[in-house]
């Protein structure tokens, strides 16, 4: 297996493999906040996110939602289909929290009757600005048809994930998705779905079970990620 590094991000490394069109993702133990300004390492975090993402992507596949995920190959690694990442962060919001609550002057915890889908331009130098469809077209990020596909996929994924997390006694507050194009131009779900990319609250206590415990210094990150993984395993057994 080749060790040629293609890309290193805040939470993962991407490597070539000996198979054309297949890449290896290695999850890191690093946690970042404020767009990478704050950074710490937590032993076992990479393993937890790899397992959680692998289980969720496998579950989505059974529900008819395609992604780049192929299979996990170690505690911290998985194989994925090679895609060209579309530089958009697609955020789906079911409950008021975080930046949306501040932007709209709302209280955290207020339910949103119909999920809000937002788009952010993936550019660290610009601090990932909030953009709309017109900006996407102007920047030549995606076509109108591709945006329709992405928005529909995001809502479908939201429905499936809400049902899954409900079984885990967790409220899916909001989450971030990324998509890519495969060699044939098909739009596929990519990146990861984990407590790094989701805002998750316990249904009974509203305890935060995601990276907010790190952002806000209100808990042990590996403990809450382990709790999410354990609940996920229970509902999938």
UniProtKB/Swiss-Prot annotation:
InterPro entries xrefs: SAICAR_synt/ADE2_N (IPR028923), SAICAR_synt_PurC (IPR033934), SAICAR_synth (IPR001636), SAICAR_synthetase (IPR050089), SAICAR_synthetase_CS (IPR018236)
Superkingdom field: Bacteria
Any one GO molecular function term: phosphoribosylaminoimidazolesuccinocarboxamide synthase activity
EC number: 6.3.2.6
Involved pathway(s): Purine metabolism; IMP biosynthesis via de novo pathway; 5-amino-1-(5-phospho-D-ribosyl)imidazole-4-carboxamide from 5-amino-1-(5-phospho-D-ribosyl)imidazole-4-carboxylate: step 1/2
Keyword set includes Transmembrane: no
Keyword annotations from UniProtKB, A to Z: ATP-binding, Ligase, Nucleotide-binding, Purine biosynthesis
GO biological process: 'de novo' IMP biosynthetic process; cobalamin biosynthetic process
The keyword Nucleotide-binding is annotated on this UniProt entry: yes
Substrates-to-products reaction catalysed: 5-amino-1-(5-phospho-D-ribosyl)imidazole-4-carboxylate + L-aspartate + ATP = (2S)-2-[5-amino-1-(5-phospho-beta-D-ribosyl)imidazole-4-carboxamido]succinate + ADP + phosphate + 2 H(+)
HAMAP family named in the record: SAICAR_synth
Family (UniProt): Belongs to the SAICAR synthetase family.
Entries under PANTHER family matching the protein: MULTIFUNCTIONAL PROTEIN ADE2, SI:DKEY-6E2.2
Protein name listed in UniProt: Phosphoribosylaminoimidazole-succinocarboxamide synthase
Origin species: Listeria innocua serovar 6a (strain ATCC BAA-680 / CLIP 11262)
């Amino acid at each position: 297996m080749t060790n040629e590094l293609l890309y290193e991000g805040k939470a993962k490394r991407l490597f070539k493999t000996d198979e054309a069109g297949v890449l290896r993702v290695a999850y890191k133990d690093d946690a970042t906040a404020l767009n990478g300004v704050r950074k710490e390492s937590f032993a076992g975090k990479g393993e937890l996110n790899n397992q959680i993402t692998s289980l969720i992507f496998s579950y989505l596949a059974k529900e008819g939602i395609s992604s780049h995920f192929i299979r996990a190959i170690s505690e911290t690694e998985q194989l994925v289909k090679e895609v060209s990442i579309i530089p958009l962060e697609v955020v789906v919001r079911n409950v008021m929290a975080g930046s949306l609550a501040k932007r709209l002057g709302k209280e955290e915890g207020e339910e949103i009757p119909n999920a809000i889908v937002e788009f952010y331009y993936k550019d660290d130098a610009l601090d990932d600005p909030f953009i709309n469809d017109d900006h996407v077209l102007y920047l030549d990020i995606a076509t109108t048809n591709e945006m329709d596909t992405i928005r529909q996929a995001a809502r479908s994924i939201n429905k499936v994930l809400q049902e899954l997390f409900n079984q885990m006694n967790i409220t899916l507050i909001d989450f971030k998705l990324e998509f890519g194009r495969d060699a044939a131009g098909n739009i596929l779900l990519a990146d990861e779905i984990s407590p790094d990319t989701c805002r998750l609250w316990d249904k009974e206590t509203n305890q935060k079970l995601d990276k907010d415990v790190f952002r806000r210094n209100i808990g042990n990150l590996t403990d809450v990620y382990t709790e999410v993984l354990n609940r996920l395993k229970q509902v999938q057994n």
